[in-house]
Amino acid sequence: IHTYPQCRIFLFGGGEKETEVMNRWADTWPEVCNASAQLKGLQQELILMSHLQVMVTMDSANMHLASLVHTPVVSIWGATHPYAGFMGWNQNPTNAVQVDLPCRPCSIYGNKPCMRGDMACMNQIKPEDIIQRIETVLKQK
C-alpha cells in the first residue's frame, strides 16, 4: 500500500468472518474500501469491476465476473488448476499465480482436504510473485 500510494484497493465478497477482517482493513488503511459493504447488488459490483485496472482474486466467481467486464485478472490457484477449464474468460494464462506440485490439482472444485496436510499449494505462493504479476499488468495499461 505504501509503495503505491495512488492505488485504491477494493475488497469484494466474503462471509461474516471475512467481512469483519475487510472492515478492519478498510478502517486501518484509507486506500482500502470494503466494496462488499458499500455496494448494493451484483450490478454495482460489475460496474466497479469494469473500472478496475486489475482484479486480484482466487479461482472464484469474482475472477469470472471481472473477466466478463474485460478487467485483467491476476488469479491465485491452490488446489485447483486453470487447465481443468476454470480459467477466467479471455484471461492471460501467465497471470495465473500457482506453484507446480505433483499433487495438483487435488480437487477439480477445490472442495477436498489437502492430502499432504500442509496446503503447500497455497503456502508456497510468495506474496512477491503476486505483486510482480500485478505490476506487470499495470505496466501494460
Model-derived regions, located:
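Nucleotide-sugar donor-binding patch of glycosyltransferase catalytic domains
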Residues: 27-28, 34-35, 67-140
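Donor-binding and catalytic core of enzymes assembling or modifying cell-surface/extracellular glycoconjugates
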Residues: 1-79
